[in-house]
From Swiss-Prot:
It comes from the Eukaryota. It comes from Arabidopsis thaliana. A motif (Effector region) lies at residues 41-49. GO terms for molecular function: GTP binding; GTPase activity. This is Ras-related protein RABA5d. It holds the Pfam family Ras. Keywords: Acetylation, Cell membrane, GTP-binding, Lipoprotein, Membrane, Nucleotide-binding, Prenylation, Protein transport, Transport. GTP binds at residues 19-26, 67-71, 125-128, 155-156.
Amino acid sequence: MSSDDEGGEEYLFKIVIIGDSAVGKSNLLSRYARNEFNAHSKATIGVEFQTQNMEIEGKEVKAQIWDTAGQERFRAVTSAYYRGAVGALVVYDISRRSTFESVGRWLDELKTHSDTTVARMLVGNKCDLESIRAVSVEEGKALAETEGLFFMETSALDSTNVKTAFEMVIRDIYTNISRKQLNSDTYKTELSMKNRVSLVKDDNKSSTQGFGFSCCSSS
């Protein structure tokens, strides 16, 4: 726990996982939060979330990660689902091109229902399915660079890059928050566990510039 002058204050960052149905959102979350994978998991009904703790610069950070169904019939939860989010993982399945083509729609929805400064990562999931790949790494990187997103390919099945992807988003949120006047009473209130964080940046240049990572890399 932190021993700084804020008395080990904890911060809560709400992160949402979005993307088409069956791209592996729930398994990404369960792999990160519980190190579990269910090959026969059914489509998420409604909304669920998991909380994961990290320590960054001596401060306890809680990431509350929300998962919801991608099917159109569940879109009624949209506003509440996005409210207060400061980070988002936009997920597609590298073996299903249609899910990649839907990324633009999900980004538009994210922009509509959340602050434009949300830390965002494009995630090409199921990179273990290399033999039936339908979206190249280069295409994923190019889209991420165009939209100003981090990019990473993951596999919830074998854990490739899952922890790295989530923690990169969490650290980016923390970095953005740290740029602000954390000693001000306003930000202490916003960032306390009693309130959901609202992320505001000083400028329009997001630090979430395109990052390219291949799940097949050795690093």
